């Protein structure tokens, strides 16, 4: 009985839409939804035969891999140095959290103005240096731009979790390793990084 409200919410907002999506994937309707024809797995067969689907799947995989790896690595480095900063730590952490507070639509407009081929400041600087940058015509430039924007937006979220994880590690372990002669690099890889594995797994998933 105590689980009844939670089960009702999950059934209403998860299982029911998922069931509808599954049923609709086995049907085919016109543009206005007036006539519905049961086609079974024909939609899936047409999907897997489409070459553009494989290309889009590969593109999504490359994008996800770059965003996950860069987002986690850069945010971990920033969190590590933020945990070591004593003077101006609050300002440093606040600046790194700001991107998380920016709405995605606003962030998209900002990146568009920065890298626009016609009016973008960064695009103009790159062209001045001899780099032809045009995310509208070059697929590699477009992928790089989207990855950079996604990583920038994700940094603050990952940074908060990594910083909290670093601050939760007992300082006695770090001090004991330092007394034993372990340097900062060795302390990080043998103590801090292994203890951050649950946080890293959570952010990666």
Regions found by a protein language model. Give the residues of each.
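A structural signal for multi-pass alpha-helical bundles of membrane permease subunits
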Residues: 1-205
């Amino acid at each position: 009985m105590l689980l009844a409200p939670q089960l009702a919410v999950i059934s209403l907002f998860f299982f029911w839409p998922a069931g509808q999506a599954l049923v609709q994937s086995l049907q085919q309707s016109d543009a206005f939804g007036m006539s519905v024809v049961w086609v079974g797995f024909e939609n899936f067969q047409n999907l897997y035969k489409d070459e553009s689907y494989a290309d889009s799947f590969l593109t999504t995989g490359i994008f996800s891999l770059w965003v996950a790896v860069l987002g986690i690595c850069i945010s971990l480095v920033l969190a590590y140095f933020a945990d070591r900063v004593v003077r101006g730590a609050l300002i440093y952490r606040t600046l790194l959290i700001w991107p998380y507070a920016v709405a995605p639509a606003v962030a998209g407009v900002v990146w568009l103005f920065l890298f626009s081929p016609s009016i973008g400041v960064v695009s103009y600087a790159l062209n001045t240096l001899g780099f032809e940058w045009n995310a509208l015509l070059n697929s590699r430039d477009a992928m790089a731009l989207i990855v950079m924007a996604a990583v920038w937006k994700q940094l603050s979220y990952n940074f908060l979790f990594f910083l909290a994880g670093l601050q939760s590690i007992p300082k006695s372990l770090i001090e004991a390793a330092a007394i034993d002669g372990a340097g900062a690099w060795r302390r990080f890889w043998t103590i801090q990084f292994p203890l951050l594995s649950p946080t890293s797994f959570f952010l990666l998933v």
